[in-house]
């Protein structure tokens, strides 16, 4: 899949844009002032496969905690700043790898210059985060409504503020809870600038609804070569955001590592408790780091036949099942032992 070429920026040890891989981001939902809990959550996100993590910085206590946080985690930390430019300066001083701000809401040009200068000295990029819920009044008055054109104009205005103070290590996000508006906005902005784009559907919802909306929005753009880093916004454990984000990237071939898991939807031919088996296999595969494709199929029609491309899998029978590798049957196993035998074979691969 051909990606649209963008400028490359460095976020801590991670590159975003250019020829670098598409990365997965998340945001902590702990109180940043509680450095212990925030560090614990970031470490869980790292284990899940997160590449970059963002922390809210609502006040100076939170900004001060960033010093302890950044010293004790491996992931690059992005400080999420609104309104007070001094929080951005404090965050930079305390070791963050990037800022997320809207230059237009942190004050005068002089204040923007101070933030940009400080970020430039530390080689820290700035993400301009435009959101459909926080458009400027003059833009809303111009368009009379929130729309893709309005969001893009807001983003370009913020870009110009930074460019005017000679700052170009920029990442852009234009998020909306309306999936079609989000898609249209990124399509438009990708034609206007070559800065890396951070994809996401804001306020996407709970794990179920949010996964659907994010997969459609982010997936559509990735299929068109648009996007350099992604964040799946979910109401829930941030680790789930990372899991969903990584699966989206796997689907489009942007992430080759880790297990790809497939299973059939079951039908009248299914004679084993495939739903229970599939859920158990999927859960146990979370601890597997091997880059393999695993299939759990309800009958011999779907597996090993239709699942021939899988590295290993199960095909159900009546009270028993077949374990196959690359379409070749290797053993017949009783239903109650299927999962254990499958995992044993995977461990030996």
UniProtKB/Swiss-Prot annotation:
Alphabetical GO biological process terms: isopentenyl diphosphate biosynthetic process, methylerythritol 4-phosphate pathway; terpenoid biosynthetic process
Key words, A-Z: 4Fe-4S, Iron, Iron-sulfur, Isoprene biosynthesis, Metal-binding, Oxidoreductase
Record-linked Gene3D superfamilies: Dihydropteroate synthase-like, Sulfite Reductase Hemoprotein, domain 1
N-terminal signal peptide: none
Keyword Iron annotated: yes
Family: Belongs to the IspG family.
HAMAP family assigned to the protein according to its UniProt record, in alphabetical order: IspG (MF_00159)
Alphabetical list of PANTHER family matching this protein: 4-HYDROXY-3-METHYLBUT-2-EN-1-YL DIPHOSPHATE SYNTHASE (PTHR30454), 4-HYDROXY-3-METHYLBUT-2-EN-1-YL DIPHOSPHATE SYNTHASE (FERREDOXIN), CHLOROPLASTIC (PTHR30454:SF0)
Listed name of the protein: 4-hydroxy-3-methylbut-2-en-1-yl diphosphate synthase (flavodoxin)
């Amino acid at each position: 899949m051909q990606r649209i070429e963008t400028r490359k920026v460095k976020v801590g040890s991670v590159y975003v844009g250019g020829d670098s891989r598409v990365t997965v981001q998340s945001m902590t939902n702990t109180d940043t002032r509680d450095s212990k809990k925030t560090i614990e959550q970031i470490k869980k996100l790292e284990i899940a496969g997160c590449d970059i993590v963002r922390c809210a910085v609502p006040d100076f206590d939170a900004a001060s905690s960033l010093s302890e946080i950044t010293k004790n985690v491996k992931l690059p930390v992005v400080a999420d700043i609104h309104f007070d430019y001094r929080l951005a300066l404090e965050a930079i001083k305390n070791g963050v790898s990037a800022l997320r701000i809207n230059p237009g809401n942190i004050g005068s040009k002089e204040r923007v210059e101070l933030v940009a200068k400080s970020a430039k000295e530390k080689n820290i990029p700035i993400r301009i985060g435009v959101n459909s819920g926080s458009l400027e009044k003059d833009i809303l008055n111009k368009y009379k409504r929130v729309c893709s054109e309005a969001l893009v104009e807001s983003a370009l205005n913020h870009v110009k503020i930074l460019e005017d103070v000679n700052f170009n290590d920029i990442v852009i996000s234009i998020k909306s809870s309306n999936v079609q508006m989000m898609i249209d906005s990124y399509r438009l902005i990708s034609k206007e600038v070559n800065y890396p784009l951070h994809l996401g559907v804001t306020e996407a919802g709970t794990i179920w609804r949010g996964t659907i909306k994010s997969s459609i929005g982010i997936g559509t753009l990735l299929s068109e070569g648009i996007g350099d880093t992604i964040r799946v916004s979910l109401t829930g454990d941030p680790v789930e955001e990372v899991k969903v984000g990584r699966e989206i990237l796997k689907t489009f071939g942007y992430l080759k590592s880790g297990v790809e898991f497939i299973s059939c939807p079951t039908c009248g031919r299914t004679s084993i408790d495939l739903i229970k088996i599939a859920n158990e296999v999927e859960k146990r595969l979370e601890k597997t780091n091997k880059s393999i494709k695993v299939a759990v199929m309800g009958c011999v029609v779907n597996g090993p036949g239709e699942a021939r491309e899988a590295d290993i899998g199960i095909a159900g029978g009546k009270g028993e099942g077949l374990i196959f590798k690359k379409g070749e049957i290797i053993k017949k196993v009783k239903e109650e032992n299927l999962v254990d035998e499958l995992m044993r074979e995977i461990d030996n691969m």
